[in-house]
Swiss-Prot record:
Span of domain S4 RNA-binding: 88-150
Family matches, as NCBIfam families: PRK05327.1, rpsD_bact
Cited Pfam families: Ribosomal_S4 (PF00163), S4 (PF01479)
One Gene Ontology cellular component: small ribosomal subunit
Keywords: Ribonucleoprotein, Ribosomal protein, RNA-binding, rRNA-binding
GO BP terms: ribosomal small subunit biogenesis; translation
Entry function: One of the primary rRNA binding proteins, it binds directly to 16S rRNA where it nucleates assembly of the body of the 30S subunit. With S5 and S12 plays an important role in translational accuracy.
MF GO annotations: rRNA binding; structural constituent of ribosome
Family label: Belongs to the universal ribosomal protein uS4 family.
Gene: rpsD
Organism: Fusobacterium nucleatum subsp. nucleatum (strain ATCC 25586 / DSM 15643 / BCRC 10681 / CIP 101130 / JCM 8532 / KCTC 2640 / LMG 13131 / VPI 4355)
Name of the protein this chain belongs to: Small ribosomal subunit protein uS4
Signal peptide: none
Domain of life: Bacteria
UniProt KW Nucleotide-binding keyword: no
Amino acid sequence: MARNRQPVLKKCRALGIDPVILGVKKSSNRQIRPNANKKPTEYATQLREKQKAKFIYNVMEKQFRKIYEEAARKLGVTGLTLIEYLERRLENVVYRLGFAKTRRQARQIVSHGHIAVNGRRVNIASFRVKVGDIVSVIENSKNVELIKLAVEDATPPAWLELDRAAFSGKVLQNPTKDDLDFDLNESLIVEFYSR
């Protein structure tokens, strides 16, 4: 399986992302890149926005393109549907519910089989949850220290409901752009793929 092993701070600096979004509590001491004062081309801004979304959601190009194409086929605004599909991925829902401190940690928790959806264990990070689904930590994993610590600080968005005592959460509605925890201009991504 292909993985992005690039240093997080280096990539954050290149894309103009605050590392806190990714759960990294460090900051880079490096100066601004030499060509940072140049006005980027239209293509460069579109590419950067796409790369930012891919990096934050930890999705490779092939999978990201498939998600985009699926969103483009659906009726409605393509960019908002794309955001909805990315937010409804199981690894992201686990992170947003507060079972993990970062999206990367959430991906590992899912792939190690600590999460169940509607009572059935799911270990596929790209699994897409639906409205009404109940995402929970399996019984054996409720005393894993990482999950316990993460749930204490959890503040889920409005589209999710968290039950701290039961280590479970419910999807109340589909996420919208307002529910994002970072700035994303989805129209630039749509323009990039519709060239």
